[in-house]
């Protein structure tokens, strides 16, 4: 074990390949899965404090949890892959809660009320810490596939669903996954432009106007952004000070770029995104210039598939009721466990569908007014926007050029069509 411990603590060599059970830990050292229980000072300290009945150090507990999370891995060809523990709760809790809710209608009310409250609590908990989590993406994907699995195993065998209807539901699930994959390709990041760089200099000490670029005491060549425009470009007095103020306000110290108009820095992803709309926890990614259209199509196909699937389920388990009323009145549905489970899943899908319908409505209204969700929040914070329809419509008046022009711009927007000017933007 001492040999394994010594091996796991040595520095990583970038030219040396990893075996299937080796990985680079969060400290940059080469480690092995067999050594997962070795050399954990933070865990030892937490156990010692617990054994001695001493108060725990919050930092040591968080470091111990981070170490445990870092060492939860599975063997892979190019090295052991880390397992995100936030993926585990949806895989276990969702089937358990739904099967418990199918036992009795009172349990169904309790579970279907507790589930969204728990998810909202976890959302605000993680959003406050500005941390990334795969919990919501895992919950969304597992809900989609688990509902489809129950549809195939519980509803289709009843004989009420035709082959054409099954093909439509299957195509809807497939299109939802395809457009989700396209959305996950990236929101479109802000890159340094050639016009924003004017010199390449090698520094032996950190300049006062530039962030440090020293790594391990070595000097590195850095490109200095045009954060201050010289007066010779315009020849007008006072332009230098104005340009300096604009450039400094839009300079992102984290990404080392000057943000163009309508771009913003996401604290969760740690990147600057072109035409940033919002960070969506359900896809674990930002929605920006490059993936906004595919994000909208993902929502649309999911909602159409979900609504159609719910109608088929209710028509199967409540044949004597209309689809619009069966969700609220379906007598004897709890007489059989299979029917109760299908009915419970229909209610769960309806709750999810209602939330995503609200999101789709907000997206359509924002696109119609040519405003992003981020711009709407900033305008409301600065009290410079008009609110209508109980806050569903937020009109800033900055970029709107009419309904058809706004939608044309959204459907045809590219990085080249974005305005090059700079505007003061806050972080999200």
Curated annotation (Swiss-Prot):
Annotated catalytic residues: 280 (s-palmitoyl cysteine intermediate)
Lumenal-facing ranges: 100-105, 154-160, 316-350
DHHC domain boundaries: 250-300
GO BP term (any one): protein localization to plasma membrane
Protein's UniProt keywords contain RNA-binding: no
GO molecular function: protein-cysteine S-palmitoyltransferase activity
Catalytic activity: L-cysteinyl-[protein] + hexadecanoyl-CoA = S-hexadecanoyl-L-cysteinyl-[protein] + CoA
GO cellular component term of the entry, any: Golgi membrane
Function: Palmitoyltransferase that could catalyze the addition of palmitate onto various protein substrates and be involved in a variety of cellular processes.
Family classification: Belongs to the DHHC palmitoyltransferase family.
Protein name from the UniProt record: Palmitoyltransferase ZDHHC23-B
Organism: Danio rerio (Zebrafish)
Lineage of source species: Eukaryota, Metazoa, Chordata, Craniata, Vertebrata
Gene from which the chain derives: zdhhc23b
């Amino acid at each position: 074990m001492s040999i394994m411990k010594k091996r796991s603590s040595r520095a990583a060599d970038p030219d040396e390949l990893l075996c299937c059970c080796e990985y680079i830990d969060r400290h940059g050292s080469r480690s092995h899965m067999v050594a997962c229980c070795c050399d954990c000072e933070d865990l030892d300290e937490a156990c010692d404090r617990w054994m001695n009945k001493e108060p725990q150090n919050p930092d040591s507990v968080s470091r111990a949890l981070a170490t445990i999370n870092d060492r939860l891995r599975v063997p892979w060809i190019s090295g052991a892959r880390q397992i995100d523990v936030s993926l585990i709760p949806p895989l276990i809790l969702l089937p358990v809660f739904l099967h418990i809710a199918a036992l009795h209608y009172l349990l169904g009310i309790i579970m279907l009320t507790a589930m969204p409250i728990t998810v909202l609590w976890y959302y605000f908990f993680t959003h406050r810490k500005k941390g990334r989590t795969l919990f919501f993406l895992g919950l969304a994907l597992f809900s989609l596939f688990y509902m489809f699995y129950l549809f195939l195993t519980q509803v289709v065998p009843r004989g009420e669903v035709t082959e054409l209807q099954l093909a439509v539901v299957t195509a809807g699930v497939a299109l939802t996954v395809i457009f989700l994959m396209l959305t996950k390709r990236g929101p479109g990041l802000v890159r340094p432009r050639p016009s924003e760089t004017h010199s390449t200099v090698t520094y032996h000490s950190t300049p006062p106007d530039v962030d440090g670029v020293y790594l391990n005491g070595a000097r590195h060549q850095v490109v200095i952004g045009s954060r201050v425009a010289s007066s010779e470009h315009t020849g007008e007095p006072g332009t230098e000070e104005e340009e300096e103020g604009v450039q400094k306000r839009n300079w992102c110290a984290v990404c080392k770029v000057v943000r163009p108009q309508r771009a913003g820095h996401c604290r969760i992803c740690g990147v600057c995104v072109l035409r940033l709309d919002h960070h969506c926890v359900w896809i674990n990614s930002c929605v920006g210039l490059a993936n906004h259209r595919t994000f909208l199509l993902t929502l649309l196909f999911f909602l159409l598939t979900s609504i159609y699937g719910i109608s088929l389920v209710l028509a199967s388990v409540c044949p004597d009721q209309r689809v619009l009323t069966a969700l609220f009145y379906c007598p004897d549905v709890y007489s059989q466990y299979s029917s109760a489970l299908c009915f419970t899943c229909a209610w769960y899908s309806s709750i999810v569908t209602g939330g995503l319908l609200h999101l789709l409505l907000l997206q359509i209204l924002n696109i119609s007014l040519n405003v992003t969700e981020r711009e709407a929040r900033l305008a409301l914070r600065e009290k410079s926007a008009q609110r209508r329809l109980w806050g569903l419509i937020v009109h800033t008046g900055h970029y709107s050029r009419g309904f058809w022009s706004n939608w044309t711009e959204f459907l045809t927007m590219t990085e080249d069509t974005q305005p090059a000017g700079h505007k003061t933007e806050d972080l999200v």
